[in-house]
């Protein structure tokens, strides 16, 4: 995987969004999804007074980005952790509050480009999809062992796949003949089980199923449900958070957490809203910001990206 091909998504916009919080000496910024370190490298370069704490559950990503960030010495602390472990990580490092948090959700370029990880549907590979290959169950195990109703639920909930029942009927029929192990067989099965009209819309017909399996294998949405509120809680007043998501389920979750923080919690009808009911957050984006057409032309993986940001303006009510 050549690092030159790794283009961080909406990089300048993320830096601009976090910038007002990161100019003070000693500011701490957390990259919750280190990946190959593109965003982290830019943060350390643009904000020379800042310290970085970076998390990733993928040991190979930590190794590669560790080489990339080595020139920054002890300004960068890399941690093998899932991003909902952020409170524990900050606790261990003795960092009570941070000034910036960045999430770039979804699969890193490296995971997509390394065939044997099984994330990509465009090439044949073992059906693994674990971001941390030292733990958990693989996509093949989900396909081979989950009850049919559970796989239907996963494809509908996480892949928004309208043809889930058709696909799962085919999966169950095929797994009885021989367990699934490789992605090409699954891609072919999906293609064969979809009606013509469904194949004409929205890119590769396997895309939604692969997304759903990846989310299930890595527990992505449940992790995110814990991680975004934890990240907001870790922000000092004036601190900022930027989140890049890549499908509507993630984006909706981020939107809900930010909207709740930016709303007053006062009972209706109060003439003056007491401090404890005032919003904790200020939204930095109107809706979700999208990548420019120029960026999508340069980096097609940016196409589905949605960026939301918020700033902490008050402490939580006691």
UniProtKB/Swiss-Prot annotation:
Keyword Transferase among record annotations: yes
Catalytic activity annotation: cytidine(1402) in 16S rRNA + S-adenosyl-L-methionine = N(4)-methylcytidine(1402) in 16S rRNA + S-adenosyl-L-homocysteine + H(+)
Gene3D superfamilies xrefs: Putative methyltransferase TM0872, insert domain, Vaccinia Virus protein VP39
EC number of this enzyme: 2.1.1.199
GO cellular component, one term: cytoplasm
Region listing for Disordered, in residue ranges: 293-318
Principal localisation: cytoplasm
Enzyme superclass (EC): transferase
Name of the protein described by the UniProt record: Ribosomal RNA small subunit methyltransferase H
Organism: Streptomyces avermitilis (strain ATCC 31267 / DSM 46492 / JCM 5070 / NBRC 14893 / NCIMB 12804 / NRRL 8165 / MA-4680)
């Amino acid at each position: 995987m050549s690092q030159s091909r790794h283009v961080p998504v909406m990089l300048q916009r993320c830096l601009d969004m976090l910038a007002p919080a990161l100019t003070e000496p000693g500011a701490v910024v957390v990259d919750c999804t280190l990946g190959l370190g593109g965003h982290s490298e830019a943060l350390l370069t643009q904000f020379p007074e800042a310290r970085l704490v970076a998390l990733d559950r993928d040991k190979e990503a930590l190794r590669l980005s560790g080489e990339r960030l080595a020139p920054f010495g002890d300004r960068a602390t890399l941690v093998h952790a899932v991003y909902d472990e952020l409170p524990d990580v900050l606790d261990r490092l003795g960092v009570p509050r941070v000034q910036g948090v960045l999430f770039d959700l979804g699969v890193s370029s490296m995971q997509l480009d390394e065939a044997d990880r099984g994330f990509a549907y465009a090439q044949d590979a073992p059906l693994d999809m674990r971001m941390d290959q030292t733990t958990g169950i693989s996509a093949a195990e989900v396909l081979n062992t989950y009850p049919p109703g559970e796989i239907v639920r996963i494809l509908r909930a996480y892949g928004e796949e309208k043809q889930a029942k058709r696909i799962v009927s085919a999966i169950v029929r095929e797994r009885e003949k021989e367990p699934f192990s490789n992605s090409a067989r699954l891609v072919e099965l999906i293609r064969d089980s979809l009606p013509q009209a469904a194949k004409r819309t929205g890119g590769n017909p396997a895309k939604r199923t692969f997304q759903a399996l990846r989310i299930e294998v890595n527990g992505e949405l449940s992790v995110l449900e814990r991680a975004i509120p934890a990240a907001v809680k870790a922000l000092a007043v004036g601190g900022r958070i930027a989140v890049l998501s890549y499908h509507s389920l993630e984006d909706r979750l981020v939107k809900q957490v930010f909207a709740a923080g930016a709303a007053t919690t006062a009972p209706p009808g109060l003439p003056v809203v007491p401090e404890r009911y005032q919003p904790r957050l200020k939204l930095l984006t109107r809706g979700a910001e999208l990548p420019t057409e120029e960026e999508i032309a340069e980096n097609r993986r940016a196409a589905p990206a949605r960026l939301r940001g918020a700033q902490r303006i008050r402490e939580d009510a006691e």
